[in-house]
């Protein structure tokens, strides 16, 4: 042990060289520079870094070798153990503070970007587009602008109310879809719903003319066949009408030459009682005419020349004027012949009795029997009809009278109610 102490003391003396014998200790710890990753690892690492420290020197003593020998020597390992905790705590605290500062700096660098983006979107008054407007009116302008856009979208997507009506009725001049006939080749007929009243009146007048034209022809044929003297009737009427238009004096002058002709008729022919009866009122009429002639001659003298001319024309055609009774008979015959003509027109209206089967509507029943379905539509519009046409039961009977044009003039229901066609094409409901 003594040899070891001597060697150490000799080596210590060589190092001192007469300089200051105070112990030399480092004033600042040397910290190794590490990266950010290394610093982050240092936060979680619990191991102690071993640092090389200088050995503690002993002060040189002169003459007291015994005391030096007797003093206990503290090994360097113990010194290291005592000094390490102090040095290590300071380094770890500095490392932790440095890492915290760097992490906080990075977080602070990211936060301003997010904070800068939020105010731009949340504050429209700071938008560059709205810099023209005052700052206090920018929010109001944006609210009004958004409301206008929403209204435009709403009205653009709103469906039109005419879509349903366009499918049911395409045009005002056409028959609705539900009332069109299945046979497309059949021409469309005019109804009160499709045409104005003026056109309906023209159609009714034409129909009446077409109905009465054949009646007049038949009546003319019957009269010409029965009476061959009908050709002379216009001349007789002209001769009879001319005295009525002239003054009473001219009428008296025309009746005077008729007397010999009428007196000759019973002599030439066999005396017949009706002829005598017809002549007697004419004689009585002559007396009244003579009295009127006398009064007229006193009042109007210059009219004699015209009376003579009329008398001459009446005397030249005594044969035509000699048969006034036959003309009256012919007129009566024409009236009698006109009655069966009206019966024939009534017979032209064909009547049908239709039975409503189960599950079939009146419109389908008309369609099956080749009737005009537009008449059903017109009947449904009659005042007071209500739901009569849609409340049929299976087995109900309907009597329909149709004219020569195929239109329904009258329809009688099983309960006694009737639908009567009017001149304008509409129907009247009668219970």
From Swiss-Prot:
Effect of knocking it out? Answer: Loss of the ability to colonize the nasopharynx of infant rats.
Induction data: Undergoes phase variation.
For this UniProt record, the keywords arranged alphabetically read as follows: Secreted, Virulence
Q: Which InterPro entries match?
A: LysM_Opacity-associatedA (IPR007340), OapA_N (IPR013731)
The primary site where this protein sits is secreted
The name this protein carries in UniProt is: Opacity-associated protein OapA
Q: Could you tell me where this protein is found in the cell? A: Secreted
Question: Would you name any one GO CC term?
Answer: extracellular region
Question: Locations of Polar residues compositional bias?
Answer: 1-14, 86-95
Record gene name: oapA
From the UniProt entry, list the residue stretches annotated as the region Disordered. 1-98
Q: Where is the signal peptide?
A: none
| Keyword Secreted carried by entry | yes
What GO molecular function terms would the record report?
metalloendopeptidase activity; peptidoglycan binding
Q: Does the keyword Secreted apply?
A: yes
What this protein is reported to do is described as:
Cell envelope protein involved in phase variation, confers opaque colony phenotype.
Per the UniProt entry, what species is this protein from, by scientific name? Haemophilus influenzae (strain ATCC 51907 / DSM 11121 / KW20 / Rd)
Q: Which family does it belong to?
A: Belongs to the OapA family.
Name the Pfam families on file. LysM_OapA (PF04225), OapA_N (PF08525)
